[in-house]
Amino acid sequence: ILRTAERLCQEVPEFEVFFAVDGEELAQPLRDEGFEVLLTDPDLPSGTDRIAQANRILGRKTVINVQADEPMVERSHVLALAAALDKENAAMATLAVAFAHEEDFLDPNQVKVVLDKEGYALYFSRAPIPHPRDAGEEHWSGKDPFAYKHLGMYAYESSFLDSYSQCEQGVLERVERLEQLRALERGYRIGVSIVAKATIGVDLPEDLENLSFR
């Protein structure tokens, strides 16, 4: 989490950086390094609910959510999120990147997103979507993608956060375990920016060991 904090300050020094955490174990190391920390309810169902609770204290008009497992986030990713939120009527925004390999496209741990012609999300799924009806039709196309890999960073309008946190989890969100589906189920538009490369996330201790920080 400290690596991510330092990285954000390095990449986007003009942005305010706050940390919304669910306990003192995470909060104190950040405070010790001079970062501003907000303690939130540990039983919230999603990261977006956590951001909503934190922003009720902060009162910011727009919020960008970078999770602590993204210590290699780049300036371009943050600015792309801001640009996606600027799309007309977008209440929420996120990032996507083309899949490099078919096995990644078929992996349920790598979330797929399909877009409309204007760059808004139609649906997110762990399943490989869309599914070809006819035998022999391409299921995956690396050259001309019809689905992208979702990158789990978000931007929000504050009014949307207030509404989102008051909504119960929908069926799709519970089935897929994807918090952004609550927004789509409620009719909100999610702007998506396609970026050139994915971030390098850290899910396991060995992932951190394999990273080279600059």
Task: Describe each PLM feature range.
Residues 1-9:
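Short, well-formed alpha-helical segments that are part of the catalytic scaffolds
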Residues 12, 18, 22-80:
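Short phosphate-binding loop-to-helix
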Residues 1, 27, 47-51, 78, ...:
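A general structural signal for well-ordered alpha-helical segments in protein cores
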Residues 17-19, 63, 93, 121, ...:
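Hydrophobic/aromatic residues located in beta-strands of well-ordered beta-sheets
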Residues 75-169:
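Conserved core of the sugar-phosphate nucleotidyltransferase
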Residues 14, 60, 88-91, 188:
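Short, high-confidence coil segments that cap the C-terminus of an alpha-helix
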Residues 138-214:
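Conserved alpha/beta core of the MobA/IspD/sugar-nucleotide pyrophosphorylase nucleotidyltransferase superfamily
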